[in-house]
Design a protein with these regions (language model features):
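Glycine-rich Rossmann-fold phosphate-binding loop(s) that bind the pyrophosphate
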Residues: 91-94
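Glycine-rich FAD pyrophosphate-binding loop
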Residues: 104-131
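Short, solvent-exposed loop/turn and secondary-structure capping segments
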Residues: 126-129, 259, 359-364
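Conserved FAD-binding subdomain of flavin-dependent enzymes
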Residues: 134-175
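Helical element adjacent to the flavin cofactor pocket in flavoenzyme catalytic cores
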Residues: 265-347, 352-353, 365-366, 371-380
Length: 531
């Protein structure tokens, strides 16, 4: 045999030998798996059964999770020992008032055992809406509601209307939105009042869709400290979808990617109604009058104790072996320091990190100027004081340390005559004075340097509002950029100047803008620093 033939023979033998070894190993592996399978299947499963027992077992916080409406419609039995308990609620916004209402309705706690501690002289928190004789009508913002606000509707079906005897707030709200459903006829404009014809399209590329899906599927932990611009590129940012989304929810490119994901998860069921707001529902009046006042009356009728001009500065905790117990509340009542001693029979509810804390108000002739960082920041200071006691209480500085990136500005404009009405009607295709849906949500001026958006809800937005007046809510996403008509940043503008910029984007002739605003509208500009 030649050397070449010998090499081939040796190689063939080696391959055959290797193949036999692999086959032998494979057979052993399969035999092992079969034995394991036999062992597993032959063992009786006496310790396992299909059941839902224990599904409603309470967790370490004393609560359990459920779904459906079975438990929502049942009236709870009176909790044992509730007559010996008291509750202290810090703040009187929607969250605190809702907690108090549930304590009365479901917890069956005595009203005079519930104490609401509010730094201001009025309840409502961010759900505001008021007439200030020195400024005019003021709304800092508004809530966009939909049919899956289960907790809200559960609450308000129990809150009596303050307008219509014998019905609930939910009844009124439901009937109104059935008779006058919400939808927009013009979602965006360009070229000073022309319909941008977004026409319900998202204009997302396949790559843009995949970026959104990837964010949706990413673990929360992997999004900590990431911004939206870390996870999206121009495939998303140049889409009409991003125009809809960022203007509806006030998102900047540098905002939290995790917050963006959570918004996706919360509202994905209404993605089809995003372009024309047909998924949304609105109250008859501003949300202070439509939601807060009925809740406040319900609580007052139950004997709940409202303590206004009471600023809570700290909650002192005793921490032992991982157990945290609130022992005292430190507060200032009309500027005088006071302490409230707590026992384990006292419940404490704290609204921390309010986005409307430190609001700065302007008016027709003054910009909302002021250094928010050196102002008393109320519930942010409270959260910082609590967080110093234990790391598990969170990191408030993550949310309130860079107001250049968290500030946001809105304005309330009240028309004084008919001159601007035709321009409004031309855009939204509805007369704003009918008392019915007007814009159906925000109209975004997509080529505005401030990225200005504005909306007119059903008029009048205030019970005291004259029928000849229209209240408009306006906001700008970019507050530090000079405007198109007003050549200065929105944050430095008076209410009059914001109104001028708004009318400019309606197509009012430039030489008429200033005169029309002087005679035809009043604007109140509002800087909100922690959005």
């Amino acid at each position: 045999m030649s050397k070449k033939g010998l090499k081939v023979g040796i190689a063939s033998a080696a391959v055959i030998g290797a193949g036999a070894a692999v086959l032998q190993a494979k057979n052993k592996s399969e035999a092992k798996k079969a034995a394991e399978k036999t062992t597993v299947t032959s063992e009786p499963k006496n310790d396992y059964r299909n059941t839902e027992r224990g599904k409603d077992k309470k967790n370490s916080k004393g609560i359990y999770y459920t779904n459906g409406n079975y438990e929502a419609f049942a009236r709870p039995e009176k909790p044992e020992g509730v007559d010996e308990k008291s509750a202290y609620l810090v703040g009187s916004g929607l969250a605190a008032l809702a907690a108090a209402c549930f304590l009365v309705r479901d917890g069956q706690m005595k009203g005079d055992h519930i104490h609401i501690l509010e730094a201001m002289d009025i309840a409502g928190g961010a759900c505001d809406g008021i007439y200030d004789p020195t400024r005019g009508y003021i709304m800092r913002g508004g809530r966009e509601m939909e049919n899956h606000f289960e907790c809200l509707w559960d609450l308000f079906h129990s809150i009596p209307s303050i307008e219509t005897p014998g019905v609930s707030v939910l009844d009124e709200y439901y009937w109104l939105n059935k008779k006058d459903p919400n939808y927009s006829l013009c979602r965006a404009t360009k070229n000073r009042g022309e319909d941008a014809h977004t026409d319900g399209k998202f204009n997302l590329s396949q790559k843009g869709c995949m970026e959104i899906m990837k964010l949706f599927m990413t673990r929360d932990e992997d999004l900590y400290d990431k911004t939206i611009e870390d996870v999206f590129d121009d495939e998303v940012f140049n889409s009409t979808f991003w125009l809809y989304w960022r203007t509806m929810f006030a998102f900047e490119d540098w905002h939290s990617a995790l917050e963006m994901k959570l918004y996706f998860q919360r509202f994905i069921h209404h993605i089809g109604g995003l372009p024309d707001f047909s998924a949304l529902k609105f109250t008859k009046y501003n949300q202070y009058e439509s939601l807060i006042l009925p809740m406040k009356k319900y609580l007052e009728d139950a004997g709940v104790d409202f303590q206004f001009n009471t600023e809570v500065t700290n909650v002192i905790f005793e921490i032992n072996d991982g157990k945290k117990v609130a022992k005292a509340i430190e507060c200032k009542v009309n500027g005088v320091e006071k302490g409230i001693v707590l026992t384990e029979n006292d419940l404490v509810f704290v609204t921390n990190g309010s986005c409307t804390e430190g609001t700065i108000y302007g008016d027709q002739n003054h910009a909302p100027n002021g250094d928010a960082e050196v102002r008393t920041s109320g519930c942010w200071t409270l959260w910082k004081n609590i967080a110093r006691q234990d790391p598990s209480f969170g990191h408030p500085e993550k949310f309130c340390s860079d107001i250049a990136k968290t500030n946001w500005e809105s304005a309330t404009i009240t028309t004084l005559d008919e001159k601007i009405i035709p321009y409004i009607t031309n855009i939204c295709k509805r007369d704003p004075r009918t008392g019915k849906v007007v814009t159906g949500g925000i109209v975004s001026c997509m080529d505005s340097k401030w990225l200005m958006s504005w909306t007119i809800n059903r008029q009048g937005q205030f019970k005291t509002q004259g029928k000849d007046k229209v209240c408009v809510w306006v906001y700008g996403l970019f507050t530090d950029v000079p405007g198109d008509f007003i050549k200065k940043p929105m944050k430095d503008c008076t209410g009059k100047e914001v109104t001028e910029e708004w009318q400019y984007h309606h197509g009012v002739r430039t030489e008429q803008v200033e005169d029309r605003v002087e005679r035809s509208g009043v604007g109140v500009s509002i800087m909100v620093v922690y959005i």
